[in-house]
Amino acid sequence: MSLVDLGKRLLEAARKGQDDEVRTLMANGAPFTTDWLGTSPLHLAAQYGHYSTAEVLLRAGVSRDARTKVDRTPLHMAAADGHAHIVELLVRNGADVNAKDMLKMTALHWATEHHHRDVVELLIKYGADVHAFSKFDKSAFDIALEKNNAEILVILQEAMQNQVNANPERANPVTMATPFIFTSGEVVNLASLVSSASTKTTSGDPHASSTVHFSNSTTSVLATLAALAEASAPLSNSHRATANSEEIIEGNSVDSSIQQVVGSGGQRVITIVTDGIPLGNIQTAIPAGGIGQPFIVTVQDGQQVLTVPAGQVAEETVIEEEAEEAEKLPLTKKPRIEEMTNSVEESKEGTERELLQQRLQEANRRAQEYRHQLLKKEQEAEQYRLRLEAMARQQPNGVDFAMVEEVAEVDAVVVTEREMEERETEVTGAVGTAEPHTGVSMETVST
């Protein structure tokens, strides 16, 4: 049996999970080949969940990070199909937990995409980067949000709070004062998560300033806040207690709202200050140890402002109305899009101008040709006119051209009257009388 056949049989045995057949084929020298998609035996064993087969192949030295033609590793296969035991086996054998395929998606992305909660927990346990972004600028949190998977959302949110952001360039730090609660109605408690970006707030004494890191990496944070605010039950005004780590801002009765705009790195952070309601009687809503969850505050104009207690890790985000959707585009892409649009318009104008010039040149060329043809016709007409005039001048000379032509046609002998008389005299003088020749036609021409 050839090596090619041995390699094909090894792929099929790995797909079916036939451990003994895999051992026999490798003992007979079967190469670690791949199919036309670049799928290795370990890929197939991981995809179909054959733990023992994968273990045999790893012990035999198969590459644990082998890549298909779309750069998928066996860990991608196992995570996408929900084989947690295979995932753990691969990670314990040194597989790259943050390997990215052609779409720049990690195993955590694929596990979240297919709702495999146990695989997500396992990957996070072994250090998967929850801040990794795919080719479509989406993190695992964004995918879980699109799939409406609340359990995975909670897991990822906790992991993001505990894990240092691996993409610090996506966060623009903004220095603000100690967090406040801005309210003009009811305070809604968020039961779990807020955003996919890792943010930190630090506080010392009550009057010290805190630093809040904002991130524009997640485009669906606003939708998360709105959905969670609707899902959470509003707290009654009678269930309020004093929040020692928060400061309440009460707006002036005359100036009901003040808007402060803080810009940093091209971003805009809007703080809305409205008529405040002191939180003096909250008893059951806030735990004795302090506020354990973030708060979202709804103001009258439909905006929502998230605020957190001092020392808690969360993100402060302003949700504006749908008119601000245009600002969701990455700020670095807007000038590029405008430049591309301008260049396209300029190229269109240049093309149209060149086309018009070509048409004008073609019209001029045809007009020149028509002008030459007209001049030539005029010259020919002039020549015909001159010929006719010459012929008309030759007619009055007294020469009968038609008669001459007729004489030429019958081959007649043309003699004058004088010649006839002389001829008759000669004949009569010699013979006396003579008859004219009968075979010759004679014509008298008088001048």
From Swiss-Prot:
Q: Name one GO molecular function term.
A: identical protein binding
- Phosphoserine found at: 253
State the residue spans of region: Disordered.
418-447
ANK repeat extents: 5-34, 37-66, 70-99, 103-132, 136-166
- Which PROSITE patterns does the entry mention? ANK_REP_REGION (PS50297), ANK_REPEAT (PS50088)
Which Cys pairs does UniProt list as disulfide-bonded?
none
Where's it found, cell-wise? Nucleus
Q: Which GO terms describe its cellular component?
A: nucleus
| Keywords tagged on the record | ANK repeat, Coiled coil, Nucleus, Phosphoprotein, Repeat, Transcription, Transcription regulation
Coiled-coil region list: 345-395
This chain belongs to which protein, by name?
GA-binding protein subunit beta-2
**Taxonomic path:** Eukaryota, Metazoa, Chordata, Craniata, Vertebrata
